[in-house]
Regions:
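Cysteine-centered catalytic environments shared across enzyme families
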Residues: 1-350, 362, 366, 491, ...
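Adenosyl-5′-phosphate
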Residues: 1-4, 21-22, 166-169, 196-201, ...
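Conserved glycosyltransferase catalytic-site signature
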Residues: 99-100, 119-121, 175, 358-363, ...
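Glycine-centered helix-coil hinge/cap
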Residues: 108-112, 402-405, 600, 632
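Active-site adenylate/phosphate-handling loop in enzymes that bind or generate adenylated species
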Residues: 140, 364-424, 469, 480, ...
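Conserved adenylation A10 loop of the ANL superfamily
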Residues: 282-286, 379, 665
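Positively charged, low-complexity/disordered segments
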Residues: 669-671, 675
Length: 675
């Protein structure tokens, strides 16, 4: 695991070693074991290294035999052994045993198709000097991050935004990114909160071609997409396609097939030259991973859990039960309101606003694990591929609700939702009813957004400040060459190009609709799961895991996102992921069948709980001074983005226990670092 960074300069420009060094310093936490930079007159590639495979010899960047092709990567390639054998048989020679060392040779053999051969999590940078070509590639599911910025003097890239900002890239707020963040509580790619700094999308490749007829040119192409479901019969058989065999006709056969794929995924993710531990929440995803890895491990696995004093949020008893059942060496940490001290650390780790409060728990459990091991497995991704979110049950219920008389869904249900007292408890009934009452009146995709939406389009319009001259750039502005320049001396705001109340070029729903339209041939719930896999999984869940773990020099591997398993499950009809109404709407029925002989029955059939932090109660208690200070009207007025009166009303509504959900208040906490 590493942090990677670098630059390719335009003709006539020179590489500034100080800027490159600043990038490496900004990523030192991602690779505390080693750091190195390769440079010629046109390109510089650097890596900070956390040594997992070939601990002593696996330095990056690496080259081919004559030094003409250079590569570095952040991640792990689980099939590097078989790829090395194939390349060695073709005459390639390697400098070390590390997985990165094969990349220049694989590129020589397969050209731009080389990512298709890789099994693992990776963000790769490769410089082909003879062709004047830079290649950036990101893994299929977006497990490892990669960012880039095209500027007046070249293309800069890095694992984290902070490394690009360290070069002095001109800063301006990306208006559309802010608009989407307010609805989602994270910034969805390919945008970042900084205009001109972009995220390379999962399963895509960026190619910088210096030899293009009209000068250096950039192209981004998709090299992997989620396979189509193709079709499903009433018996649940999905027809094969793209060379895939038909699925078994029986549920028992399907369970056996998925069990084999799961075992293969966990085994592949255990490849390491250092001990591998595991995060354990007590939910079915991480519990299945731990149960399988303990069966495969040569000794007792170390597991790590986090809990809370608030019993409605605490899952330590369930994690402890699984640990005892599997025979692991178990470690626990408890999150308390003093975690407010972490706010600034989290802002530094994420570089841009990120309001998923579970990042606090992730930070603390990663810190605990990093004191014992360099690598852990986690159960992340299980909800998106097996069908684990409660909102999928809401999607099924809403489909029925839309067939009921309108007075029930548009008058009676909203009235009931308004009558339920506000609550700070986890999975609060008042918030769930409010969101369902709103969503049942919408089309399926709009409802799917509504189940999680923080600020609606209407609410965002009331939240923005009046036009104020703050530096705000739209996506269209950010793409203009005049706005891509390097200005080392300036972190100042740029002149306004859009009035704040009309920040966005599009509503947030359009982002989801594009992902939904890109996956047309599937059952309804499978299509919605594909939307989540391409947006919230990448930019919320996996971003959270990467930043909180790498801040502590810890590698987290996600076997439930092993691409052969993901591609298999994409073909499985949605009735095996979220049961229909008449069968009880159980979540993850297929995974529960797989887990039946691995875990205690109460763990297998335990309802979905989720990993949440008791922020609502904290913000009324120990964290109240933080809330009222950060969102004080005068401070909000100075920032110039939000209407101070609107923000103050939200704060007061929360503190007084009225209707507004807590996300309305804590959501705005991190924005102070951007504007």
């Amino acid at each position: 695991m590493c942090g990677i960074y670098g630059v390719v300069v335009r003709p006539g420009a020179a590489i500034d070693p100080a800027r490159v060094a600043a990038m490496g310093a900004a990523l030192a936490h991602r690779g505390p074991d080693d750091a190195h930079v390769w440079r010629d007159g046109t390109a510089a590639l650097g890596a900070t290294r956390l040594s997992i495979i070939d601990v002593e010899g696996g330095r990056q960047p690496v080259t081919n035999e004559d030094g003409s092709i250079v590569a570095c990567q952040n991640g792990e390639l689980y099939n590097y052994g078989e790829l090395r054998q194939r390349l060695a048989a073709a005459g390639h020679r390697f400098d070390n045993r590390g997985d990165t060392d094969l990349l220049p040779h694989l590129y020589e053999a397969d050209g731009l198709d080389f990512p298709r051969r890789l099994r693992g999590m990776f963000a790769v940078a490769l410089w082909d000097a003879p062709r004047g070509r830079l290649v950036l590639a990101r893994d299929r599911l977006g497990i490892k991050p990669l960012h880039y910025a095209e500027t007046a003097d070249g293309l800069w890239f890095a694992s984290e935004i902070k490394a690009i900002l360290a070069t002095g890239v001109h800063r301006a707020l990306d208006a559309q990114a802010l608009h989407d963040y307010l609805s989602l509580d994270y910034v969805p790619g390919p945008a970042t909160m900084f205009a001109g700094v972009r995220k390379l999308a999962a399963g895509t490749m960026l190619v910088w071609d210096a030899a293009a007829p009209r000068g250096p040119a950039i192209g981004v192409r998709r090299w992997w997409s989620l396979p189509a479901q193709h079709g499903a019969s009433a018996a649940g058989q999905a027809a094969g396609g793209d060379g895939a065999p038909p699925l078994p006709r029986s549920e028992a056969g399907l369970v056996a097939l998925v069990r084999t794929a799961l075992e293969d995924a966990v085994a592949a993710h255990l490849v390491s030259d250092v001990p591998v531990g595991a995060f354990l929440s007590g939910g079915i995803d991480s519990s299945v991973v731990v149960a399988l890895m303990q069966r495969m491990a040569g000794g007792r696995v170390e597991t790590f859990s986090v809990g809370f004093d608030d019993r409605s949020y605490d899952e330590l008893p369930f994690a402890k039960r699984v640990a005892a059942h599997c025979g692991t060496v178990h470690h626990e940490a408890v999150v308390r309101p003093a975690a407010a001290d972490l706010v600034h650390d989290l802002v530094d780790a994420f570089d841009e606003p990120f309001a998923d409060s579970s990042a606090i728990g992730s930070w603390i459990v990663a810190r605990e694990a990093a004191g014992h091991t360099k690598v852990v497995l986690s159960g992340d991704g299980g909800d998106e591929v097996f069908g684990g979110y409660v909102i999928y049950q809401a999607d099924r219920l809403a489909a029925i609700g839309r067939r009921l008389p309108s007075f029930l869904t548009q008058r009676l249900l909203p009235a009931i939702a308004r009558a339920v007292p506000a609550s700070d408890r986890k999975m609060a009934l008042d918030l769930r009813l409010q969101r369902f009452a709103r969503g049942v009146a919408l089309d399926p995709l709009a409802a799917h957004l509504a189940w999680r939406e923080i600020f609606t389009e209407e609410a965002k319009a009331t939240l923005y400040a009046a036009p104020s001259g703050i530096g705000v750039a739209s996506h269209a502005d950010a793409d203009r060459p005049s706005n891509r320049g390097i200005d080392p001396a300036s972190n100042a705001r740029v002149g306004a190009r859009h009035a704040v109340p009309s920040l966005a070029n599009r509503p947030t729903l359009d982002l989801l609709r594009a992902a939904h339209d890109a996956y047309p041939h599937a059952d309804p719930i499978n299509r919605l799961m594909a939307v989540d896999a391409s947006i919230s999984l990448v930019d919320d869940m996996l971003t959270k895991v990467d930043r909180t773990s790498m801040a502590h020099g810890l590698e987290v591997r996600v076997p439930l996102l092993d691409h052969p398993l993901v591609e298999l499950l994409a073909r499985v009809p949605d009735v095996y992921k979220v049961r229909p109404i008449h069968r009880g709407m159980a979540l993850k029925p297929l995974l529960r069948r797989v887990a039946a002989d691995l875990l205690p029955r109460d763990i297998v059939h335990r309802p979905k709980a989720g990993f949440h932090v008791p922020i609502p109660a904290w913000l009324k208690g120990e964290l109240r001074p933080l809330l009222t200070d950060v969102l004080a009207p005068e401070r909000v007025r100075r920032q110039g983005v939000f209407d101070p009166a609107a923000v103050d009303a939200l704060v007061r509504a929360h503190l007084e226990g009225r209707r507004n959900p807590v996300s309305y208040t804590h959501l705005t906490l991190p924005t102070k670092r951007i504007v």
